């Protein structure tokens, strides 16, 4: 049967990545000056913004002949990139090996395994150059595995390049009226790619990154020096870093806002119960950053603010959506 694309029928899973919806927020931002819109990346087929990166990098490797049937994809991930790569590997017939932080939710680990990925759980609270860190474990596996590629999203220029299109979508969806974009930063690929596109269209667009307490990213942006004193354990997954990723272009980011583990978790739960949006931990962090910025008087009546919600809440059932976990962290009574 010939597929008639005019009927909105797709022939590949990968066609369901990108062109995610933009939704205006009402209840969670009530009382704040300006208008607020969520870029819902959970509408990608793999339910996160990382689908875009995985597709872009895999297709690039295929074009260059680096990936062939039977090849292996190796990556370091807090969960979402790993899931997206495992999904595409299942589709394409590649072996997929993911080194994942033990801070990642058990849900993410099980989802990776469900797609056939081999998972290596690594301690989160070790230095990046420690042989047990997920960076070093992934590198070692890649070096020991013939016919493999190491995606290396923290230092791969294709990561931000993949999100140039995300910036284009945001610009077109707001008809060029956007004044601020708020994005959580881990590898920095999402925020950097979006920022490049938006600033090319209008240099006055303010790009606001969201960082975690326990991460060195905000301080580095301000001083251009890595301060190890900034680094200590924290709970939020997929945000902040204990190293400085070259995938982050600090020159196109105007400001970073830090949020606490507790505030981000509570805000994600509030988002579900007010807007009906069941989003991930970093989505709570992003909307918490918006509130802090608004309370500091930095938005006005003319502000058109886009907040990127990176993934779906189903990946955090055993964490922020578990009352037991929240109580153990001291986040709720």
From Swiss-Prot:
Known cofactor(s): pyridoxal 5'-phosphate
Biological processes per GO annotation: alpha-amino acid metabolic process
Annotated effect of mutating residue 241 to M/Y: Loss of activity
Keywords: Lipid biosynthesis, Lipid metabolism, Pyridoxal phosphate, Transferase
Residue sites binding pyridoxal 5'-phosphate per the record: 80, 186-190, 282
Domain of life: Bacteria
Family per record: Belongs to the cysteine synthase/cystathionine beta-synthase family.
Name recorded for this polypeptide: Cysteate synthase
Organism: Capnocytophaga ochracea (strain ATCC 27872 / DSM 7271 / CCUG 9716 / JCM 12966 / NCTC 12371 / SS31 / VPI 2845)
Underlying gene: capA
């Amino acid at each position: 049967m010939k597929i008639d694309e005019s009927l909105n029928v797709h022939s590949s899973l990968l066609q369901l990545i990108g062109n995610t919806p933009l939704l205006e927020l009402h209840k969670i931002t009530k009382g704040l000056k300006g208008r607020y819109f969520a870029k819902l990346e959970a509408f990608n087929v793999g339910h996160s913004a990382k689908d875009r990166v995985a597709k872009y990098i895999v297709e690039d490797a295929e074009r260059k002949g680096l990936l062939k049937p039977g090849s292996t994809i190796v990556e370091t991930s807090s969960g979402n990139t790993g899931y997206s790569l495992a999904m595409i590997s299942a589709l394409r017939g590649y072996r997929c090996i993911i080194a994942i932080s033990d801070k990642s939710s058990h849900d993410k680990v099980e989802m990776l395994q469900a797609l056939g990925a081999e998972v290596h759980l690594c301690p989160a609270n070790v230095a990046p150059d420690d042989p047990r860190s997920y960076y070093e474990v992934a590198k070692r596996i890649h070096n020991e595995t013939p016919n493999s590629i190491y995606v290396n999203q923290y230092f791969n220029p294709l990561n931000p390049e993949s999100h140039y299109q995300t910036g284009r979508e945001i610009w077109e969806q707001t008809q060029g009226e956007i004044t601020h974009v708020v994005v959580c930063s881990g590898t920095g690929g999402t925020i950097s790619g979006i920022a490049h596109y938006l600033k090319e269209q209008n240099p006055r667009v303010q790009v606001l990154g969201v960082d975690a307490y326990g991460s060195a990213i905000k301080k580095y942006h301000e001083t251009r020096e890595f301060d190890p004193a900034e680094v200590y354990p924290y709970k939020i997954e997929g945000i902040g870093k204990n190293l400085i990723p070259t995938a982050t272009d600090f020159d196109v980011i105007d400001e970073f806002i830090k949020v606490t583990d507790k505030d981000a978790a509570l805000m994600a739960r509030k988002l579900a119960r007010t807007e009906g949006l069941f989003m991930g931990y970093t989505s709570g962090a992003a909307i918490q950053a918006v509130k802090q910025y608004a309370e500091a008087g930095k938005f006005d009546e003319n502000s058109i603010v886009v907040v990127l919600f990176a993934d779906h809440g189903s990946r955090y059932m055993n964490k922020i959506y578990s009352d037991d976990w929240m109580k153990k962290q001291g986040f709720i009574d």
